[in-house]
Amino acid sequence: CLNFLERPTDGQVLIEGKDLGTLNEKELRKQRSDIAMIFQHFNLLMQKNVIDNICFPLQIQGVKKKEARAKARELLKTVGLEEKEKAYPAQLSGGQKQRVAIARALASNPKILLCDEATSALDPQTTASILELLKSINEQFQITIVIITHQMSVIREICNRVAIIEHGELVENGL
């Protein structure tokens, strides 16, 4: 519901003071372009190599191939995978796949990065490295990162504000 891919049955979703429920389709698409997502299972295109996976959202936006590849290479450095540019997802570890997914999410310069159980499929050491990367991205790009997780260790490690939602109800929030 945060990105309004699904409409909430009740309440409001406010992003930068805008109630997404009041926006028309064109305005909603524009607002969604400021929100990127990473998922538990990476959602990489298996038939595309790493650089093409990262370029994919830029291709959809009509960015020229040379410019898209330059941006993708810059993001590969950010996530520490510059040597994996030509690898395919099947050749990567889970942590490397998640780093590619993060780079792809950052390609369109979002204001908000929505992480839906982004570390739950990873081992503890890889989870720690992904959380460090997310902290670095938050500081470097000044992106708001929203983490959806059931892992309390993730919350303790990275979150500076917490909201607990149970059965669709906000039951607790704070610093």
Q: Language-model segments: what does each one mean?
A:
Residues 173-174:
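ABC ATPase "signature
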Residues 1-141, 145-154, 158-159, 164:
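ABC family nucleotide-binding domain
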